[in-house]
Curated annotation (Swiss-Prot):
NCBIfam families: NuoI, PRK05888.1-4, PRK05888.1-5. Binds 2 [4Fe-4S] clusters per subunit. HAMAP family: NDH1_NuoI (MF_01351). GO terms for molecular function: 4 iron, 4 sulfur cluster binding; iron ion binding; NADH:ubiquinone reductase (non-electrogenic) activity; quinone binding. This is NADH-quinone oxidoreductase subunit I. [4Fe-4S] cluster 1 binds at residues 64, 67, 70, 114. It catalyses: a quinone + NADH + 5 H(+)(in) = a quinol + NAD(+) + 4 H(+)(out). Coiled coil: none annotated.
């Protein structure tokens, strides 16, 4: 009978409710852990692998020599390359260089396979698209990413050069 009386008093006094409110009040006055994503961003690690980038040489010439090693090594088969046979006789160039970002698993094997460091992983990964076809990055988009993130990519590659 004594145990039943304790349970009745606990349920009438709503002990669990007051315990929960105490926990809530305790956490209410602590600093926030949550990051408000679009406005605030967490810093990425130096070796973060984001959206792909095609690089150019300092003179503006494309680095890619259309060897297709990145296409061959990609485990997800996310890279598609066509060789441009009509443009120059002394150097092979790509006519089509497409990457399906939804297929890609961001493993970095394409970056490791490239003999001229033409394709590297960029410093950002924002994949909020309104159109499903936006997941396909074409050659001009990849080159534009390379130009806009050039300083960050060069700094990362120089810092990581001793491990390559």
């Amino acid at each position: 009978m004594g145990n039943a009386m304790k349970q009745l008093m606990a349920s009438l006094a709503l002990r669990e409710l007051w315990q929960g409110m105490a926990v809530t009040l305790r956490y209410m006055f602590r600093p926030n852990i949550t990051i408000q994503y679009p406005e605030e961003r967490t810093p990425y690690s130096p070796r973060f692998r984001g959206i792909h980038v095609l690089r150019r040489y300092e003179g503006g010439e494309e680095r890619c020599v259309a060897c297709k090693l990145c296409e061959a090594i990609c485990p997800a088969q996310a890279i598609y390359i066509e060789i441009d046979t009509e443009s120059r006789a002394d150097k092979r160039l790509t006519k089509v260089y497409d990457i399906d970002l939804f297929k890609c698993i961001y493993c970095g094997l394409c970056e490791e396979a490239c003999p001229v460091e033409a394709i590297v992983m960029g410093p950002y990964l924002d994949m909020a698209y309104e159109d499903r076809n936006a997941r396909f990055y074409k050659k001009d988009q990849l080159l534009a990413n390379g130009e806009s993130w050039r300083a960050e990519i060069d700094a990362r590659l120089n810092a990581d050069a001793k491990y390559r």
